[in-house]
A protein has these predicted regions:
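Residues within the DNA-recognition helix of helix-turn-helix
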Residues: 27, 48, 158-161, 165
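Structural recognition of an alpha-helix C-terminal capping motif at a helix-to-coil junction
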Residues: 33, 47-54, 67-79
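Sigma70-family region 2
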Residues: 13-14, 40-41, 51-68, 87-90
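Short, charged helix-capping/linker segments at alpha-helix termini
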Residues: 13-22, 32-51, 152, 175-180
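A short pre-motif secondary-structure segment
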Residues: 130-134
């Protein structure tokens, strides 16, 4: 746990809204990252963040204090986002998103980073979510496993396949040379 985190959780359990506000401030960006990785839509992700923090607060009594709080919170956020995605898929036909590169990006490093982001965002959710959690939020395999509700071996496989797909897409765009 982050220093003072256990104390903040305990105060929140006792009804201290200022303590809960501090938890929200500490984790809102990471929860947003989890949500946008699943939903691929910033507006929906913002809604999911609010809903995730509401649900987490309502269910805080279910949190096991011996476990890592961020993993529990990211699991709540992932579940909220997945539910929103299922609901959206029932209501709307799937739409393809197009991410055009920013013409102002003249530096090669920025172009490569943009190309990598686009390649990751174009992955199917099964590969995209583990990639974002691992490489943007630096979660380990067991944490990703808990957040997504899949086995660690499945996480490992999806990360491997996700990296292979990203490499192939970057090679196809000429950003990197395809390595056997």
């Amino acid at each position: 746990m982050i220093p003072g985190e256990l104390e903040l959780v305990q105060k929140s359990l006792a009804g201290d809204l200022e303590a809960w506000g501090e938890i929200v401030r500490r984790y809102k960006e990471a929860v947003y990252g989890v949500s946008v990785a699943i939903l691929r839509n910033r507006a929906d992700a913002e809604d999911a963040v609010q809903e995730a923090f509401i649900r987490a607060y309502e269910r805080l009594h279910r949190y096991d204090l011996s476990r890592k709080f961020s993993t529990w919170l990211f699991t709540v956020a992932a579940n909220v986002a997945k539910n929103m995605l299922r609901k959206r898929r029932r209501q709307d036909p799937p739409a393809k998103l197009h991410y055009a590169p920013d013409p102002a990006e003249a530096v090669w490093k920025e172009e490569v980073e943009q190309a990598v982001r686009e390649a990751v965002w174009s992955l199917p959710e099964a590969y995209r979510a583990p990639m974002v959690l691992r490489y943007w939020h630096e979660l380990d395999l067991s944490e990703i496993s808990q957040v997504l509700g899949i086995r660690p071996g499945t996480v490992k496989t999806r990360l491997h396949r996700g990296r292979a797909l990203v490499r192939a897409r970057l090679a196809q765009r000429g950003v990197i040379r395809d390595v056997v």
